[in-house]
C-alpha cells in the first residue's frame, strides 16, 4: 500500500475515494527513562530514548491507518497528516495520530 502526505501519487490515477481513515498511538514514558532523557537534554545531547518512543508511536499510528484503509478496500492513502501531542499528568504520555484519505489507484 502507498501511504503519502501528498494529495496525489505521481503516475497513478485515483479511481475511487473510500473515506477518511485514522490511526492513533498513545504511549506512556517510564519515569527512569524520562529522568535520563531530561539529563541528556540538559547537557545538550539528543534524547535517544524519546526518539525511539516517538518512532515507535509513529509506526503504530501509520500501521493502524493502513489497516483501516485495507478494510475499506483501498490501495493507497493520500494527504496523510501526522500530529503529535504530549499529554497526561506531568506530560507523561505521547500521542501520535495519523489521518488521511483512503483511495483506490490504478
UniProtKB/Swiss-Prot annotation:
Q: What protein am I looking at?
A: UPF0145 protein GSU2791
- Pfam families, sorted: YbjQ_1
Domain of life where this protein originates: Bacteria
Family classification: Belongs to the UPF0145 family.
